[in-house]
């Protein structure tokens, strides 16, 4: 079951893939999700109908999701964030109890980050 995307998730997709959208698609997306304009406000500004705005937003969201399925940038980003959190925890533990095994654990986590790349 797919849960509806939050505004934050949509904005993250936009950050990763906005260059793959047309200028008009970028403008409509930004006006709605970042500037919080209504469909009617966007329609008036762009000289199109509110239904055309809704259709374009639906297409843009579909494209962003499609690009993410193909390229997987959000998953890679989330994995990197999780690894960074693990490194911070390991560093905190190492500060409390310095040991060679702690250094080894951090080195392994850093190598994992480097091998996964983004």
Predicted features by range, described:
Residues 2-17:
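Short, Lys/Arg-enriched N-terminal segment that forms or immediately precedes the first helix
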Residues 71-99:
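Intrinsically disordered, low-complexity basic tails/linkers immediately adjacent to helix-turn-helix/homeobox/MYB/SANT
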Residues 29, 42-43, 53:
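Hydrophobic positions on the alpha-helical face of helix-turn-helix-like DNA-binding modules
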Residues 49-50:
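Helix-turn-helix DNA-binding motif, specifically the short coil turn and the N-cap/start of the second
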Residues 23-34:
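Short amphipathic alpha helix immediately N-terminal
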Residues 61-68:
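C-terminal flanking helix
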Residues 56-59:
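Residues within the DNA-recognition helix of helix-turn-helix
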């Amino acid at each position: 079951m797919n849960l509806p995307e939050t505004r934050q998730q949509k904005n993250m997709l936009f950050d990763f893939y906005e260059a793959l959208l047309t200028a008009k698609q970028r403008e409509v997306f930004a006006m709605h999700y970042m500037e919080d304009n209504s469909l009617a406000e966007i329609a008036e500004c762009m000289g199109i109908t509110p239904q055309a705005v809704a259709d374009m937003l639906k297409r843009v969201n579909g494209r962003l999701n499609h690009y993410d399925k193909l390229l997987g940038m959000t998953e890679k980003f989330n994995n990197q964030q999780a690894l960074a959190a693990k490194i911070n925890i390991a560093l905190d533990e190492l500060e409390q109890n310095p040991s060679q095994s702690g250094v080894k654990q951090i080195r392994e986590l850093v190598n994992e980050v480097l091998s996964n790349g983004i």
